[in-house]
From Swiss-Prot:
Disruption phenotype: RNAi-mediated knockdown in the dorsal paired medial neurons impairs middle-term (MTM) and long-term memory (LTM), but has no effect on normal aversion learning and anesthesia-resistant memory (ARM). RNAi-mediated knockdown in all mushroom body neurons has no effect on learning, ARM and LTM. However, simultaneous knockdown with Nep2 or Nep4 does impair LTM, and simultaneous knockdown with both Nep2 and Nep4 results in a further reduction in LTM formation. Belongs to the peptidase M13 family. It catalyses: Preferential cleavage of polypeptides between hydrophobic residues, particularly with Phe or Tyr at P1'. The lineage of its organism: Eukaryota, Metazoa, Ecdysozoa, Arthropoda, Hexapoda. Binds 1 zinc ion per subunit. This is Neprilysin-3. It comes from Drosophila melanogaster. Residues 74-786 are extracellular. It is found in: Cell membrane. Residues 102-786 form the Peptidase M13 domain. Disulfide bonds join C103-C108, C126-C771, C134-C731, C190-C450, C659-C783.
Length: 786
């Protein structure tokens, strides 16, 4: 995979973590909002003020609706559509508070209901705004069995899955394109209703082992005397697209973003981070022990002797420990320009002579009819890692034991990648390591796993299905207008920043103007001819899940290799339409908001602006601010790494960024301190995005009733609702194990600190909620970059 392609709003929900195939990632997952009935006793005195106000509101609303129904039925023949709009005009009297009635249309009532189900009025918003906004949500939404995290993102994602499932299970003749029919065939092969996978057992993998060149663990065709690492690596990388030892792909050149280039980076670890190999905590030791058990179980299922397999897999882990010791931590990989090392392949061969690099890449490119010579320029992002890796491998290749360990490691990378495509005993084998790693052994409904997997494989074909079913056309222009307003607010704020010099400020405004945005979905997916072209070379066969995954890997590899001599298409989407996320790509200077996130609770054109700007507006501001975070700021308006900042402004930017890093490093969760340096870019984007969205909201208030009248049952102004809407996006519950995993691997801060950290830096929040100086949510020292 490419090293640094895009910066996403949340951690990507994929089917694997750190190389281990899992059913659920560290991102936000979950489903339906739960509705709870009121308690049966109707004791007025026992009700609090909010409940009494709700009862009064409900009574008034019931009479209003009854009156309106009479009007509707007695005037049913009228052709004047305006007479049938269920709208209540505000009144200036007969209100319990002495104010006008709240907004009582169905959208306001629903929005109010959702907020009230989450909010905890017993918590002082100036002490803990996350608890104030989310405690009731957390109480009423325990993590379901089989899940490791449960939140707003996951609920919406799983509702999207249900929409997709309902279509995928329709007859093939109902689909509009061959690509969509391929999605259906793949989905059904994953469901495996006829249990073809169970009947085949280990056979597909054992057949593959022979094609790879054998495996010492299972005594399947491996001969140490004539085995070479370079030959096996060619097969794994260049034929089957398996990740091992290091990562490489064709990506956009950071210093010339109009062209593609071969990119090479560190890699090779199966567990999420190096810490898991070094037994830094009890949890790390537990995960490592379960990893050994997982490896051993799979080997035995493939025919190996248990004790012999365990011994050989411990050898693999010891090799991975060596990789862990030379792996550069995430927090030390944030300087884009410092990591960029272009060199010819002949130079790389001198740096890391364990591999004939020219031969390796020439072999890969033959798939698309392209030759590679010693003069080919590649970009290396971790030269020290490759040099150290070379030293390790050259030493191991000098002994028979070392060569056996290398064979075991390389083939294991293929085996563990495909265990989820085999029979149930193989799929169950990793439940233990998943439980240790994430606090849950999985167990979601098979159809959900298969919808997610189909999304990963033919995501734009599935996207066509989703868009036709769920995306409303009016959302796109409304979202585009919101982005324009937030961009304008961001630029206006730039004018007020005294720490940025005039020339840098002008160039920053130019870059902000140059940011392109893509919303909803790419147009071509609704054109069956164009969609079929995208997946024309992908072969999907009924009842052949294992082989289908092999074909998908080959298709993805070939698609990537074809890019090398092609100019960069800056309108290509890097995320499918049904995804509940958003991203910024620095080499394209582009922000993207898929249809999947342009839904309630993030966005609804019928909602008050305060709610839309607090939720979706902050997402938009977040992605826009990524263009100016500690990594994005290194790219100019054309998407190229270029020193366009004045040195004094860089110095002041670094000082302000250090304040953010210190702030978040001061937060603790489950006894562990957050890594503010690792999460710096996301924290800068969170803070800047919130500020831009709030200022845009204040500048664009409308005179619609929904934007003026209070929501029923909520004694909150719309400025306060903006912040509540923002916070409730992050309501979630997570296992302790997943919290640890996120703190060690995720570039985003945990949910509660994405709320507390940002709001405590924002003076407007303190003013709106009247938080006294020195309160937790209004500290005297605040951090601000943008």
């Amino acid at each position: 995979m490419t090293r640094y392609k895009q910066t996403e709003f949340t951690e990507d929900d994929s089917s694997s973590i750190g190389g281990i195939q899992l059913n659920e990632a560290t991102g936000h997952t979950g489903m339906q909002i739960r509705y709870h009935t009121a308690r049966a006793t109707w004791n007025w005195r026992s009700r609090n003020k909010t409940e009494k106000w709700l009862l009064i509101t409900t009574f008034v609303m019931a009479i209003t609706i009854f009156t309106l129904l009479i009007v509707l039925f007695t005037d049913g023949g009228s052709s004047d559509a305006t007479k049938h709009v269920l709208h209540v005009q505000p009144h200036q009297k007969d209100c319990p508070s002495g104010n006008e009635l709240p907004c009582l249309n169905k959208h306001c009532i629903f929005a109010s209901s959702e907020i009230l189900k989450s909010i905890d009025v017993t918590v002082d918003p100036c002490d803990d705004f996350y608890g104030y906004s989310c405690n009731q949500w957390i109480k009423n939404n325990p993590i379901p069995e089989g899940k490791s995290t449960w939140g707003t993102f996951g609920k919406l994602e799983q509702m999207n899955q249900l929409i997709i499932r309902n279509v995928l299970e329709k007859p093939a003749k109902s689909f509009k394109s061959d690509a969509e029919r391929k999605a259906k065939v793949y989905y059904e092969s994953c469901l495996d209703a006829d249990e073809h996978m169970e009947k085949l057992g280990a056979k597909p993998m054992n057949d593959l082992l022979l094609q790879i060149g054998g495996w010492n663990v299972t005594k399947s065709g491996y001969n140490v005397a004539n085995w070479t690492m370079g030959h096996t690596l060619k097969i794994l990388h260049n034929k089957y697209n398996f990740n091992c030892l290091f990562g490489w792909a064709i990506g956009e050149d950071d210093k010339n973003s109009s062209r593609h280039v071969i990119q090479i980076d560190q890699g090779g670890l199966t567990l999420p981070t190096a810490d898991y190999y070094n037994n830094k905590t009890d949890n790390h030791r537990k995960v490592l022990n379960e990893y050994i058990e997982y490896m051993t179980k799979v080997c035995v299922l493939l025919g190996a002797n248990e004790s012999d397999a365990r011994a050989q897999m411990i050898g693999v882990i010891n090799f991975e420990k060596k990789l862990a010791n030379i792996t550069i931590p995430l927090e030390d990989r944030r300087n884009e320009e410092a990591m960029y090392h272009p060199m010819q392949l002949r130079q790389l061969s001198k740096l890391a002579p364990f591999l004939n690099w020219t031969d390796h890449f020439d072999n890969a490119m033959q798939m698309v009819g392209r030759r590679v010579t010693d003069d080919e320029v590649v970009v290396v992002y971790a030269p020290d890692f490759l040099k150290n890796l070379s030293d390790i491998i050259l030493k191991m290749e000098q002994t028979e034991e070392g060569k056996i360990t290398l064979n075991n490691y390389l083939v294991w990378q293929a085996v563990r990648t495909l265990t989820s495509c085999l029979s149930k005993p193989f799929r169950d084998a990793y439940k233990g390591v998943r439980k240790a790693l994430m606090g849950s052994d999985g167990g979601e409904e098979i159809w959900r796993y298969c919808v997610s997997d189909t999304n990963n494989v033919v995501g734009f074909a599935v996207g066509a299905i989703f868009v036709r079913q769920a995306f409303h056309g009016e959302s796109k222009p409304a979202a585009e207008q919101m982005i324009a307003e937030i961009r304008e607010a961001f630029k206006m704020n730039l004018q007020n920043l005294t720490w940025v010099d005039k020339q840098t400020r002008e160039k920053a405004i130019e870059k902000a103007n140059q940011i392109s945005d893509m919303i909803g979905f790419p147009d071509y997916i609704l054109d069956p001819v164009e969609l079929d072209k995208k997946y024309a070379e992908l072969n999907i066969t009924p009842n052949a899940y294992f082989e289908n995954n092999i074909q998908v890997a080959i298709y993805n590899l070939k698609s990537n290799l074809k890019r090398l001599d092609q100019p960069v298409n800056k309108t290509n989407w890097g995320m499918t339409p049904q995804t509940v996320n958003a991203y910024y790509t620095p080499t394209k200077n582009q922000i993207v908001f898929p249809a999947g996130i342009l839904q309630t609770p993030f966005f609804d054109i019928n909602n008050p602006k305060s709610l839309n700007f607090g939720a979706m507006g902050v997402v938009m501001g977040h992605e826009l601010t990524h263009a100016f975070d500690d990594q994005g700021r290194e790219y100019d308006k054309f998407g190229n790494i270029n020193r366009w900042w004045d040195s004094k402004s860089i110095e002041r930017f670094n000082e302000k960024s250090e304040c953010i890093a210190r702030q978040y490093s001061g937060y603790k969760m489950n006894g562990r301190t957050l890594n503010g340096k690792q999460t710096l870019g996301e924290n800068i984007a969170d803070n800047g995005g919130l500020k831009a969205a709030y200022h845009a909201y204040q500048r664009t208030k409308s005179d619609r009733d929904v934007d003026i009248l209070k929501l029923p049952g909520l004694n909150l102004t719309h400025s306060q609702l903006f912040f509540v809407s923002f916070a409730q996006v992050w309501c979630s519950s997570t296992t302790d194990e997943t919290n640890l995993l996120q703190m060690e691997k995720d570039p985003h801060s945990p949910s509660q600190f994405r709320v507390i950290g940002t709001l405590s830096n924002m003076k407007e929040f303190a003013e709106v909620f009247q938080c006294k100086p020195g309160k937790r949510m209004n500290p005297t020292e605040k951090c601000e970059v943008w």
